[in-house]
From Swiss-Prot:
This is Small ribosomal subunit protein uS2. CDD domains: RPS2. InterPro entries: Ribosomal_uS2, Ribosomal_uS2_bac/mit/plastid, Ribosomal_uS2_CS, Ribosomal_uS2_flav_dom_sf. The gene is rpsB. SUPFAM superfamilies: Ribosomal protein S2. Belongs to the universal ribosomal protein uS2 family. GO terms for cellular component: cytosolic small ribosomal subunit. The lineage of its organism: Bacteria, Bacillati, Actinomycetota, Actinomycetes, Mycobacteriales.
Amino acid sequence: MAVVTMKQLLDSGAHFGHQTRRWNPKMKRFIFTDRNGIYIIDLQQTLTYIDSAYEFVKETVAHGGSIMFVGTKKQAQESIAQEATRVGMPYVNQRWLGGMLTNFQTVHKRLQRMKELEAMEQTGGFEGRTKKEILMLTREKNKLERSLGGIRDMAKVPSAIWVVDTNKEHLAVAEARKLNIPIIAILDTNCDPDVVDYPIPGNDDAIRSAALLTKVIASAVAEGLQARAGAGADKAEAGQDGAAAEPLAEWEQELLAGATTAAPEAAAGEAAAAPEQSS
């Protein structure tokens, strides 16, 4: 069965690029035609690139890797959080903080501080303090949760990142490239394909297009988790050490059942509205 269908892509508006005056010439090979001043993306190529990205993500996760989901623009925030949470992967859907990848040791300290403040609040650690102190601590906790909540369980830099809009997320892209972390991303007609390892030509401005493609990547993660669990079970039965792939953590086991039930076909049911166009 196809990972995603041409009809799903069309219904989500994935074929609509930017206005012809707002484009990156490097994207020419991914463009089918232009209509009314809007570039139309070649969805046949999109399908091919989706298969390649899907396989890479699935294999990466199956061998113990993790995928960070990144999308801070309004059109992507909800789907990034929803799909990453569905498969237990880290995500950033608010502001990207410089150093999230290249200075992860410092970021990890901020994560520990966030968890410390949460524990204080839950165990009565705020009691006996002045109202001003409690207010300051609460504000600090809320700020940390807003900016770092999506990566709270990330113990190390991810194996790869999924990006919606490489132009907006240029800081994340630059950090990933500096660390040689593979980048999977939607490539709209104004993007630079040279900075992406696994491109998916498509509309990164339409809510439904971003949601559909993010769901595809999350489903690849889910399949990878399932393969990892199966490999671990096989090795346990054979009495082997299982060093090739990391076993599933408890939270991954809990997520697995629900994660594998949702598939990209769900996007077809959301196709009642007309395709959204890029501005």
